[in-house]
Amino acid sequence: MKLILTAEVEHLGAAGDTVEVKDGYGRNYLLPRGLAIVASRGAERQAEEIRRARESKVIRDIEHANELKTALEGLGDVTLSVNAAGDTGKLFGSVTAADVVNAIKKAGGPNLDKRTVQLAKAHIKSVGTHPVTVKLHTGVEAKVSLNVVAQ
C-alpha cells in the first residue's frame, strides 16, 4: 500500500514522505490515527507542499538553535548552590536536568526544556565542575560547564 505521511512516524519517515507499507499496517494503524493518507495525484501535490513547509521550518529551527547556542556558550560557568552536601563533597541527593535548567535560567540564560539537557552521568552526585551538553536541534549542541557548590 502506497501512503503519504502527514506526521513523523518513527522508523518510517517524516511528514510528506511517500512510503510503501503492508496493507494491514496502513489500514489498521496509520490511516485511522491520521498519520498518513492514501497516495494519489492530488495527495502528492499536497505532500510536496508539506515537504516545502517542513524544510522552511527546519531552517528556522536551526537558526533559532544556533542563537540559543551562542547565548548558552556566552554564559561561561553556571553555578548551582546545593544545601544538602556532606563533608566529603557528596550530595545527599542528586542534581537533575531540571535543576540544571533552573540554574541556567538564574544565570541569565534562555528558558530551556529539561529534556534537552544531557548530563555526563544520569545524575550529578558530587560538588565540583561537571560538563553538561544541551541538545538544541539535530547537529546543534551547546556545551555548558556546571559548577556545583555546597552552601
UniProtKB/Swiss-Prot annotation:
Question: The organism sits in which domain of life?
Answer: Bacteria
Q: Give the UniProt record's GO annotations in the biological process aspect.
A: translation
From the Swiss-Prot or TrEMBL record, what is one GO molecular function term? rRNA binding
Sorted UniProt keywords? Ribonucleoprotein, Ribosomal protein, RNA-binding, rRNA-binding
Please provide, in alphabetical order, the Gene Ontology terms of the cellular component aspect for this entry: ribonucleoprotein complex; ribosome
Q: What else is known?
A: Binds 2-aminothiazole antibiotics, which are antitubercular agents.
Q: Record's family?
A: Belongs to the bacterial ribosomal protein bL9 family.
What does this gene product do?
A: Binds to the 23S rRNA.
Protein name according to UniProt: Large ribosomal subunit protein bL9
Q: Which organism is it from?
A: Mycolicibacterium smegmatis (strain ATCC 700084 / mc(2)155)
